[in-house]
Curated annotation (Swiss-Prot):
Residues 1-78, 103-125, 228-266, 290-311 are annotated as: Disordered. Functions as a negative regulator of salt stress response. Functions as a repressor of WRKY8 transcription factor by decreasing the DNA-binding activity of WRKY8 and acts antagonistically with WRKY8 to regulate sodium and potassium homeostasis under salt stress. Residues 240-249 have a biased composition (Pro residues). Interacts (via N-terminus) with WRKY8. Keywords: Nucleus, Stress response. GO terms for biological process: intracellular potassium ion homeostasis; intracellular sodium ion homeostasis; negative regulation of DNA-binding transcription factor activity; negative regulation of response to salt stress. Highly expressed in roots and at lower levels in rosette leaves, cauline leaves, stems, flowers and siliques. Disruption phenotype: No visible phenotype under normal growth conditions, but mutant plants show enhanced resistance to salt stress. It comes from Arabidopsis thaliana (Mouse-ear cress). This is VQ motif-containing protein 9. Pfam families: VQ (PF05678). One of its GO terms (cellular component) is nucleus. Induction: By salt stress. The gene is VQ9.
Length: 311
């Protein structure tokens, strides 16, 4: 029973929709036919009735002329003016019309720049600021060299040039820059003593170079060696054979230093309580100085030591 009721309801709905669709189709068809009739009347020759209808339609379609004239006048009033401007003057004309400040700046005289005062530095920066540097002036090297070279070396140079030895002046070391006067009082005794040692070593090195320029074969002999030979008793000379005479090349070099005492080497100076005299380079280079451990160079001529002469 339910199935038969549902089928009957569906069939009635389908029939209703079919009738509504057919009704819509008929109305659409009628409307289409009416439009075709209207168009066919326009294509056909106009009759009196059709001419009156067409004139009425034209009058309704055309706008009235007065409002059109008013609109044209309003358009002419709102149109901007047209300028014929040269391309070179375009910028100036635009600036004049727009009233830009760039044009006013060009025409107006230039204003002087305003210098703002610099902000003052704080007192803390002034307190932390270091003192200004002291300008250090180096002393001329000529004065320093004259002070370091002893006076006796000038006389020796004159005597040796007469004999025929040409000595080249030794190149001095570069002097240290002096300390600024501000820190002169703060110098420690250790630094002053080190400076004294440095100056003494420099003087000894310069004298050693000057003495070594005489003859590279013969060593230096101290005057104390000659004094011991002169003061020795004749019995000692008779008991021991006399030493061999040195070659003639060393005779010239030995006679010259007798007038000037040889400077003591650094570290070889004798103490006041020591019974021994000053040590000379000939003692260091003698063959009997085996305890010192210095080797004898083959180019030097060996000389007897005072110990050998005394025994």
């Amino acid at each position: 029973m339910d199935k038969s009721c549902n089928s009957s309801g569906d069939s009635s709905a389908v029939s209703a929709s079919a009738t509504s669709s057919t009704g819509n189709n008929t109305t659409n068809r009628d409307h289409y036919l009416r439009q075709l009739n209207k168009l066919s009347h326009k294509i056909s020759k106009p009759t009196n009735s059709s001419s009156s209808v067409s004139v009425a339609n034209r009058e309704i379609d055309l706008p009235p002329p007065p409002p059109l004239q008013i609109n044209q006048g309003n358009l002419h009033q709102h149109q901007p003016p047209v300028y014929n401007i040269n391309k070179n003057d375009f910028r100036d004309v635009v600036q004049k019309l727009t009233g830009s400040p760039a044009h006013e700046r060009i025409s107006a005289p230039p204003q002087q720049p305003i210098h703002h005062p610099k902000p003052q530095q704080s007192s803390r920066l002034h307190r932390i600021r270091p003192p200004p540097l002291v300008h250090v002036i180096n002393r001329p090297p000529g004065l320093l060299n004259d002070a370091l070279i002893p006076q006796g070396s000038h006389h020796m140079n004159q005597n040796w040039t007469g004999v025929g030895f040409n000595l080249r002046p030794t190149a001095p070391l570069s002097p240290l820059p002096p300390l600024p006067p501000v820190h002169a009082a703060a110098e420690s005794p250790v630094s002053s003593y080190m400076r004294y040692l440095q100056n003494s070593m420099f003087a000894i090195d310069s004298n050693r170079k000057e003495f070594s320029g005489l003859s590279p074969l013969a060593p230096l002999v101290s005057p104390r060696w000659y004094q011991q030979q002169e003061n020795a008793p004749p019995s000692q000379h008779n008991s021991f054979p006399p030493p061999h005479p040195p070659p003639p090349s060393s005779a010239v070099s030995q006679t010259v230093p007798t007038s000037i005492p040889a400077p003591p080497l650094f570290g070889c100076s004798s103490s006041p309580k020591s019974p021994y005299g000053l040590l000379s380079p000939s003692i260091l280079l003698s063959p009997s100085s085996g305890q010192l451990g210095f080797p004898v160079s083959p180019t030097t001529v060996p000389l007897p030591s005072p110990k050998y002469k005394g025994h």
